[in-house]
Curated annotation (Swiss-Prot):
Keywords: Cytoplasm, FAD, Flavoprotein, NAD, NADP, Oxidoreductase. Its cofactor is FAD. This is Soluble pyridine nucleotide transhydrogenase. Belongs to the class-I pyridine nucleotide-disulfide oxidoreductase family. The gene is sthA. It is found in: Cytoplasm. It comes from Escherichia coli O9:H4 (strain HS). PANTHER family: DISULFIDE OXIDOREDUCTASE, SOLUBLE PYRIDINE NUCLEOTIDE TRANSHYDROGENASE. Binds 1 FAD per subunit. It holds the Pfam family Pyr_redox_2. Its main location: cytoplasm. One of its GO terms (biological process) is NADP metabolic process. GO terms for molecular function: dihydrolipoyl dehydrogenase (NADH) activity; flavin adenine dinucleotide binding; NAD(P)+ transhydrogenase (Si-specific) activity.
Amino acid sequence: MPHSYDYDAIVIGSGPGGEGAAMGLVKQGARVAVIERYQNVGGGCTHWGTIPSKALRHAVSRIIEFNQNPLYSDHSRLLRSSFADILNHADNVINQQTRMRQGFYERNHCEILQGNARFVDEHTLALDCPDGSVETLTAEKFIIACGSRPYHPTDVDFTHPRIYDSDSILSMHHEPRHVLIYGAGVIGCEYASIFRGMDVKVDLINTRDRLLAFLDQEMSDSLSYHFWNSGVVIRHNEEYEKIEGCDDGVIMHLKSGKKLKADCLLYANGRTGNTDSLALQNIGLETDSRGQLKVNSMYQTAQPHVYAVGDVIGYPSLASAAYDQGRIAAQALVKGEATAHLIEDIPTGIYTIPEISSVGKTEQQLTAMKVPYEVGRAQFKHLARAQIVGMNVGTLKILFHRETKEILGIHCFGERAAEIIHIGQAIMEQKGGGNTIEYFVNTTFNYPTMAEAYRVAALNGLNRLF
């Protein structure tokens, strides 16, 4: 006789991965519950990560545009805004996103349960509710989408009022004049842009020898130059020896012997999965040192009825990819296999000022692979649309095979880069000879547009062939 469960599946977490999984499951007729530890749905992406940081960036970039564009400002007065005012803008966006996502669950009759989940056995969860009660829930299968949080080394006092991580920085109540940022990954670089855009002094401590080494080197070098040009002090190949909080700020002692002092510190060096409270040992699952789970191509863990998606499985740790992972896992859970799969070349968007976006191979990778490629470039300053809106900083770079004309990689630096990249991505994904740089020469673009950069870059690259 088949076992009776409360639900066909329980999804732990309501971020992009959890939402994608839950929506995919209910659309296939499954009885689903979503467990969310906080009062509102959306996960870290909506409340502490992607959405608020991008809302902050947008507000700051508009202030920069006002102060630098002679159409708006004669430089006799500068527009300034407090960090608190800019945070209010982010809060408004968060509230809109939360209401919208709550509506998704309500319209699809997907039950939301608030509390902290932990496994009791292979098919049973205990739910620690906010009122102190404990509920027992059973399901045939589970999808873990509990996300990640900023990594906290034990020798850093995050209870100090001037030491922040990328979550708590959104609760800053003072106006910093000087910020230390430890960790020059994506989050560190994005916040360096935000604070410098607010005219705050920034020291960016990088534990490696260049910024964002996974990027095409020209993109990384462009970001380094613009940071330098804006006044950000970048310190490469440095690690902290000791971090001490004091009454008027933070002092960082580096292993190189240097000492740095600032009003506050943003520690942005790594993240860890939110798995420590799930009691995974009760179902025979283990995580790595960063709290992450290993999965197969269908997002199954070592326990075939337990799936995991999003930040909790590590790379690529992107909200966009997490949603797709959730959708694919839902299909695999219901049907036993997934016909859909993540695309091979996942685009990355880095919301520094200016933006950076990439898809496909870098020049360094193609050179190491001994692929005969050529480069086509378009400078934003040569585009009519960029001249009209005063968006002169930036470039689009297309890497393509010299012989087949196949597009191998696209890299964009400049305002709206994360939007512009998708035009090229759409062509790269075409099969049967559809992926060719000649598409951009043979099609007609609206004029004037930023999309026209593809035609300019394609002509530039094809003209290099002989």
